[in-house]
Amino acid sequence: MATPHINAEMGDFADVVLMPGDPLRAKHIADTFLQDAVEVNNVRGMLGYTGTYKGRKISVMGHGMGIPSCSIYAKELITEFGVKKIIRVGSCGAVRTDVKLRDVVIGMGACTDSKVNRMRFKDHDFAAIADFDMVRNAVDAAQALGVKARVGNIFSADLFYTPDPQMFDVMEKYGVLGVEMEAAGIYGVAAEFGAKALAICTVSDHIRTHEQTTAAERQTTFSEMIEIALESVLLGDKA
């Protein structure tokens, strides 16, 4: 049954959904990687598709920018459409010099300055972590594809234009691999509603060196990240 934000029916989505922030990237993923993809959502332009990858039913849908937006879609997919696993496939900014532009980062955990998980967890700190099997499958998929993926903590920021750039120094000290805006929220939603989640990000810009990819590149490239996500789903089916 349709929700206020998703005009699909039960069964339209696969049990695994890849979620980029940009709905146009979702369309690109469906057009490029899925066979027989059909549109299953277009409310507010947040495009969603379901197709098959090597015979396996998989969906892809945008989640927008920031924890409030992605939390709405993740919650509805899990509770109303039976989704069991969400893989965020997005971009992040690097804060460490040993992390390079276009590196693939697998978010084992997600720090955040958002209060949403504290709201869920009775004002205590909640360790927002990815599902271990999904992390392991993503690492194995990356190795099989010959992609060197970094695994560790990422930081989900509430503000894109931060008033406190010194926080980047703290992140670097604590070994944070990249900054994005959604993973901690998706991990929190998954934990609350009994699903599993993982964030795989490609470094789109470097906060230290000021290197960056273009908007067009972010929309239509980063194929290694998508291939890792898709192949990890197949590995999960074999477990």
Swiss-Prot record:
GO-annotated biological processes: purine nucleoside catabolic process
Gene Ontology MF, one: purine-nucleoside phosphorylase activity
Site keyed Important for catalytic activity: positions: R218
Assigned EC number: 2.4.2.1
Any one Pfam family match given in the protein's UniProt record, by short name: PNP_UDP_1
The keyword Glycosyltransferase is annotated on this UniProt entry: yes
InterPro entries to which the protein is assigned, alphabetical: DeoD-type, Nucleoside_phosphorylase_CS, Nucleoside_phosphorylase_d, Nucleoside_phosphorylase_sf
UniProt-annotated catalytic positions: D205 (proton donor)
GO cellular component, one term: cytosol
Binding-site residues for a purine D-ribonucleoside, renumbered to this chain: H5, E180, M181, E182, S204, D205
Binding residue positions for phosphate: G21, R25, R44, R88, V89, G90, S91
This protein's UniProt keywords: Glycosyltransferase, Transferase
Enzyme's top EC category: transferase
Catalytic activity: a purine D-ribonucleoside + phosphate = a purine nucleobase + alpha-D-ribose 1-phosphate; a purine 2'-deoxy-D-ribonucleoside + phosphate = a purine nucleobase + 2-deoxy-alpha-D-ribose 1-phosphate
PANTHER family to which the protein is assigned, alphabetical: PURINE NUCLEOSIDE PHOSPHORYLASE DEOD-TYPE (PTHR43691:SF2), URIDINE PHOSPHORYLASE (PTHR43691)
Reported function: Catalyzes the reversible phosphorolytic breakdown of the N-glycosidic bond in the beta-(deoxy)ribonucleoside molecules, with the formation of the corresponding free purine bases and pentose-1-phosphate.
HAMAP family: Pur_nucleosid_phosp
Summary of subunit composition and partner proteins: Homohexamer; trimer of homodimers.
Protein family membership: Belongs to the PNP/UDP phosphorylase family.
Protein name as annotated: Purine nucleoside phosphorylase DeoD-type
Gene: deoD
